[in-house]
């Protein structure tokens, strides 16, 4: 399989911001192009999802999770405890006061650690606290150029001022390296999984 992505102004801006405007090239399918098939996805119709333990395919839309959090957590806990003999996962206790409570968050990797994504997180956290003592947030930019730009535009400062830990660019959080949650903690991560 391969995919074809049409470059646009956002792509051009990315190269310009990263000091490589000459690297931008307009790309689109040729007028005379033959393909075995087409899978067209209107990304504006795709709902945000979350992958829950114990497998990346165990996904729910954010709306489903918000509406049925306690039931979903019971199902995950029961399935995990059957799957891992002798283990007693307790994820249901993370649901109280009508919400899921987490102790750790991570924004990292090629999917989560993008410049735009980290800027959005910084904008949300600006002037706020991410919950020092109750919640730990680590942010791993996906590249050194992204980190440098976050420092230049002030977003790195906003994250640090909110109590987030700004980490080095590092390929590892996606597979669990770094920021291992403490026993019994619930960690939520925006990474490639």
Label for each model-derived stretch:
Residues 1-193:
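Fe-S-dependent hydro-lyases/dehydratases of central metabolism
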């Amino acid at each position: 399989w391969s995919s074809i992505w049409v470059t646009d102004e956002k792509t051009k801006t990315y190269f310009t911001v990263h000091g490589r405007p000459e690297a931008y090239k307009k790309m689109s399918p040729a007028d005379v192009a033959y393909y075995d098939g087409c899978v067209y996805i209107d990304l504006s119709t795709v709902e945000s999802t979350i992958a829950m333990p114990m497998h990346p395919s165990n996904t729910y839309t954010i709306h489903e999770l918000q509406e049925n959090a306690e039931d979903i957590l019971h199902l995950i806990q029961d399935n995990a405890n059957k799957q891992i003999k002798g283990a007693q996962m307790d994820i249901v206790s993370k649901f109280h006061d009508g919400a899921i409570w987490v102790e750790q968050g991570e924004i990292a990797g090629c999917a989560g650690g993008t410049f735009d994504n980290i800027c959005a997180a910084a904008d949300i956290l600006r002037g706020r606290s991410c919950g020092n003592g109750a919640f730990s947030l680590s942010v791993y930019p996906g590249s050194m150029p992204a980190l440098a730009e976050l420092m230049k535009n002030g977003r790195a400062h906003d994250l640090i001022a909110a109590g987030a830990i700004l980490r080095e660019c590092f390929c590892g959080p996606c597979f669990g390296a770094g920021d291992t949650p403490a026993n019994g903690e619930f960690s939520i991560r925006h990474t490639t999984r």
